[in-house]
């Protein structure tokens, strides 16, 4: 398939910035929440600077190992992730790390722990627009290896496993604490099934990230902080739990980006 890159000065319609503004960056870190972009960019590297804010996409540039790295929010869910990836690919981004929050469904995983997802159950609709359901949602080996090595080096409490990516926060994740409490028949009992199969966590973006990246020829990985432990409660943990996870996630992500920027094979 031919690839269509943007002109250096072209402002891309959705993200609202140009390749020229990326200063040659080829690695992007992707939080979901636009409000987390600025603190993340400043925590990850040096000389952090604002690029643009348009729709759900807030973007900053930071420097890790003296190399420009993009930090860009994706909003919630697969559609906005795929749009972001399409436009970042046109501007020369090659490697991506999702930086998010998640709810675990396994007793062995605790609040504040880190999950590195190596694959995802495709409960979303977006990925089906890029590949049939038989096609696996798997992370880049290189990016995932970098994340695991960085987690080991940081001494983080991490788990490597599989996510279940749902288009919805309530029914698709079999949550009954919604406005009506209604969960369609097709989703009832599914959390127990995913638990039995060893799935670690529910979230809303990773399957779209992995499948879209593969379709576009990009390399992607995902690291998430655990803020809900659904074997105990449906409630999101207090902010201090996220802050603890955020600190480790920053160390892990920075370490992984440093490895990826070395442009050499990564060995276990």
Residues covered by each model-derived region:
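Metabolite-binding pocket within alpha/beta catalytic cores that recognizes anionic/polar moieties
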Residues: 1-146, 150
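Conserved active-site and cofactor/substrate-binding residues in soluble primary-metabolism enzymes
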Residues: 31-35, 76-79, 83, 91, ...
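Flexible, glycine/charged-enriched surface loops at secondary-structure junctions
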Residues: 47-53, 155-162, 261-268
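Short acidic/glycine-rich loop or secondary-structure boundary segments that cap or lie
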Residues: 105-107, 124-125, 167-174, 231
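Active-site rim beta-loop-alpha module in soluble metabolic enzymes
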Residues: 138-198
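Generic non-transmembrane alpha-helical segments
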Residues: 146-154, 212, 252-263
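A C-terminal functional module that forms or caps the active site or interfaces directly
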Residues: 188-227, 232
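His/Asp/Glu-rich mid-to-C-terminal helical/loop segments that flank catalytic regions of hydrolases
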Residues: 230-268
